Amino acid sequence: LKEGDHQLEGSLETTVAEINDSGGQATAVAANISEEDDCMRVIEEAKAAFGSVDILINNAALNYYIPVVDYPTSRWARAFAVNVHGPFILSKAVLPDMIERRSGAIVNISSGAAIGPGRGPYEDSQVRGGVMYGASKAALERFTQGLAQEVYQHGITVACFSPSQVVPTPGTVFHKLVSGLDDPRGEPPELMAKAALLLASEPLDQVSGRVTYSQQILKEFGWIDEATGTGVERTGSGYSQI
């Protein structure tokens, strides 16, 4: 919640202050998304502060870079609980109000890790330890399209997107995916925010069930002029092709 509570830079308090200072309204709830009771508390506190939930962004994720042969079962289960079960629980919690209003949007954040290596033989067989994260994000993409079909009749959008390029954050810097927060190879966080807004606000029939990539979808709808990265220069996951 506070700066210094975690080894990574940043805090919920800082984020809330930045939103409020820029003219928005925000409140922070420290919660463990792998726990159902905590998920329900997040929704109840959001409703108490702002009313019924119109848009749910499932952005929380957990990753450990460990080869399967060495992966502790407890960590595997915890990561899936955050990456897959959390979005299910939160979506289930907000759906009754959305169904009653016949409107709403659920946007899930996936990752290029959902793109598998394909079948062998493998010229590059270096162990990177990304099996769990990729599997959980692939599950989230399948969950997205299945839920989109279920709630389509109620006028609710469900969509999913990944960053087209690695977004510099304290976490991606820590894992050496980018060299720093100002790494020019990275994707500005603002593009992720715009893509989430696009999927939550464009007409249902144009976006629901989409599994896409930030710059791909922004360029498709004319929100940006130039695009690069996954979904543009490189083929996305299987679910993004259907």
Predicted regions and their residues:
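A short, exposed helix-loop element centered on a Lys and neighboring polar residues
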Residues: 91-92, 145
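C-terminal helical subdomain
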Residues: 153, 160-161, 179-242
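The beta1-alpha1 cofactor-binding region of Rossmann-like NAD(H)/NADP(H)-dependent oxidoreductases
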Residues: 9-10, 30-42, 73
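Catalytic loop of short-chain dehydrogenase/reductase
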Residues: 107-153, 165-166
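Conserved NAD(P)H cofactor-binding loop of Rossmann-fold oxidoreductase domains
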Residues: 59-64
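Active-site loop of short-chain dehydrogenase/reductase
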Residues: 23-25, 52-53, 98-112, 153-157, ...
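Substrate-binding pocket helix/loop in short-chain dehydrogenase/reductase
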Residues: 19, 67-68, 75-77
